[in-house]
């Protein structure tokens, strides 16, 4: 006899045991091979799962219970340590399979570069997609110290893939001058410093569209999420990010997938970062799936 795995801390709380009957699939991407400052986000997915044990299954934000959403936690991918290219290929292939099985991908990072292969996989099925990007950093570099495969490049790659006019960034407060100039010149949407208010203004314009949402935990002020590789002072509160997640849930956009990245537990002995992240994942499941 085995005790209920859904309450073991090895999977996200209340994860179903049946992949076939699930609508969404949670999967971890434990990669921090290109991190330029502080590594450890490869340990993020499992710490988020463990922190989920402290959650209530009911959300007063969504007025829903996790028993109402069929999701399966596939665990962490076995990515080759130190090999970004092969790791990204594996992530893209896995998301291809999820989409072929008509599952909604919910990815846990890991550094933000892991979002890039997901964008590519999603674009094959949803060529008209838009991306909502919530982050402290612009991530619009073409390369970092000569390396195009970097955690500082995924949104620039997304602009090349789907067109900058289909990329909407919120909460941005850090980047090179050239990144901010690119955003201004290219036609992409960038809201600096804030998330909830500008997002609510943009969502009606995205009504009816297929939207992928990528959230970097460092959009939060370090007071709320110190456990991240590149913390940036001057961020938003946990309350504002919850408000943004709820706003997306109550909008007319069609969320086709999502990820939450850059939880680096080594820098947060209090565990407030994975605790917050687990709550965000709960709201994403209840509001977007």
From Swiss-Prot:
Describe which pathway this protein belongs to, using the record's wording.
Amine and polyamine biosynthesis; putrescine biosynthesis via agmatine pathway; putrescine from agmatine: step 1/1
**What reactions does this protein catalyze?**
agmatine + H2O = urea + putrescine
Record's InterPro entries?
Agmatinase-rel, Ureohydrolase, Ureohydrolase_dom_sf, Ureohydrolase_Mn_BS
Q: What is the protein name for this chain?
A: Agmatinase
Enzyme Commission (EC) number: 3.5.3.11
Q: Which GO terms describe its molecular function?
A: agmatinase activity; metal ion binding
Q: What does this protein do?
A: Catalyzes the formation of putrescine from agmatine.
Q: Which PANTHER family match?
A: ARGINASE/AGMATINASE, GUANIDINO ACID HYDROLASE, MITOCHONDRIAL
- List UniProt keywords, sorted A-Z: Hydrolase, Manganese, Metal-binding, Polyamine biosynthesis, Putrescine biosynthesis, Spermidine biosynthesis
- What GO biological process, any one, is recorded here? spermidine biosynthetic process
